[in-house]
Amino acid sequence: MKNVGIDIGSTTVKVVVMEGEKILYRIYQRHLSQVRQATLKALEGAKQFLNDTFQVAISGSAGLGLAEDAGVDFVQEVFATYKTVMEYEPDTDAVIELGGEDAKIIFLSGGLEERMNGSCAGGTGAFIDQMATLLNVTTEELDELSLKHERIYPIASRCGVFAKTDIQPLLNEGAAPADVAASSIFQAVVDQTVTGLSQGRRIEGKVLFLGGPLFFFKGLQQRFQETLKLGEGKAVFPSWAQYSVAIGAAIYTRGLEKSYTYEEFTGKLE
C-alpha cells in the first residue's frame, strides 16, 4: 500500500508518495496562504501513483486546521521529523531545521529535546525573503552573492525591522552587496538559531540540516558549517531536506488502519 505525507508549513506545501522506503513522487511549492487549493493542486501530480487505496497523514504548522476539517490523521511535525531521521540517518546527534516562519533544534543524543522559535520570523525563511527584498534581489541572487563575500558585518536577525536598521546604513556607506547580503544576512540567521535556540548546549557530533532554506541556500549551509566548526562528514545536508516532515508523515501512516481512494481523500479536502 502507498503512503502519503503532506506537510503544510507557513509558506509552502510539500507532498510525498512512498512505497516502502522508496519515494515515488514529491512536490514542494508555495501556497500563498491558499492552503486548501494549493494542497489539492499538489496532489494532482500524485494521482498517477494512487490508483489503489492509500494511507495518508497531514503535518506542519498550517496543516492542523485542514486535517481537522477533513477528519484526516494529523502528526506533529517534530515527531514526523524524528521518524524521518530514524529511517534515513539514525546515528544523528542533532537536527537543525529552518522553515518559512519557524526554526528548531532537536537534540537526539543524550535524550530527545526540542528547542523551537515559533513566535518571531527572525532567523527563518521569511527573514531571508525580507532581506532579499530590501536588497532588491531575488533569494536566488542573494545566495549567489553570499558565496562571493569577503567580510562579514554583524547585523540583527531578531526581526526584519532591526535588521533593516543595520543593513541600510551599510549600503549607504558603500558596503559590497555580497558582504551585506550574503554573509552578513546568512550569518545573522546562523547566530539567531545557534545562540537563541541552543541556549548554551553544544551542537556537536553528526548534525542534520533540514528545511527549505537549508536545502536551497548554499551560502547559508556554508555559514552554519564554518560557525559550528563541524568535522568532516559531521554536517549532513540530505537531498530530501525540504521534504523531511512530509516523509515522516508518510512513514507515520504505516501504522494507521484507515485508507482512502484518491477521490475519497481529495473530496474530504474540497
Regions found by a protein language model. Give the residues of each.
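Gly/Thr-rich phosphate-binding beta-strand-loop-beta motif of the actin/hexokinase/Hsp70
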Residues: 1-20, 92-109, 151
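Glycine-rich phosphate-binding loops at beta-strand->alpha-helix junctions
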Residues: 62, 199-227, 238-242
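Conserved phosphate-binding/catalytic loops in two-lobed NTP-binding clefts
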Residues: 74-78, 224-247
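Short beta-strand-loop/turn "lid" adjacent to the catalytic site in phosphate-handling enzymes
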Residues: 19, 28-31, 46-79, 106-115
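Adenine-nucleotide phosphate-binding core of ATP-dependent small-molecule kinases
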Residues: 163-199, 242
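Glycine-rich phosphate-binding/hydrolytic loop that grips phosphoryl groups
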Residues: 128-129, 237-270
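Short glycine-rich, Thr/Ser-proximal phosphate-binding strand/loop in the N-terminal lobe
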Residues: 3-37, 41, 113-114, 118
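Glycine-rich phosphate-binding loop plus the immediately following alpha-helix
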Residues: 110-151, 159, 251-255
